[in-house]
Amino acid sequence: RVCMGKSQHHSFPCISDRLCSNECVKEEGGWTAGYCHLRYCRCQKAC
């Protein structure tokens, strides 16, 4: 399912851990708990 979350700079839809990871790499961070932090990427599970 599609969940919405926020990176450090903007909001974008997350569909899978892979997509979240790819998007956050562009932000020089990782997707974690709805935010980009360090290099760890996890899609926000709750919508």
Swiss-Prot record:
Sequence intervals crossing the membrane: none
UniProt-listed SUPFAM superfamilies: Scorpion toxin-like
Domain of life: Eukaryota
Biological processes per GO annotation: defense response to fungus; killing of cells of another organism
Cell division is among the record's keywords: no
Cystine pairings recorded for this chain: 3-47, 14-36, 20-41, 24-43
Record bears the keyword Disulfide bond: yes
Pfam families: Gamma-thionin (PF00304)
Keywords for the protein's UniProt record, in alphabetical order: Antimicrobial, Disulfide bond, Fungicide, Plant defense
InterPro entries, per the entry: Defensin_plant, Scorpion_toxin-like, Scorpion_toxin-like_sf
Family statement: Belongs to the DEFL family. Protease inhibitor I18 (RTI/MTI-2) subfamily.
Record's protein name: Defensin-like protein 1
Protein species of origin: Sorghum bicolor (Sorghum)
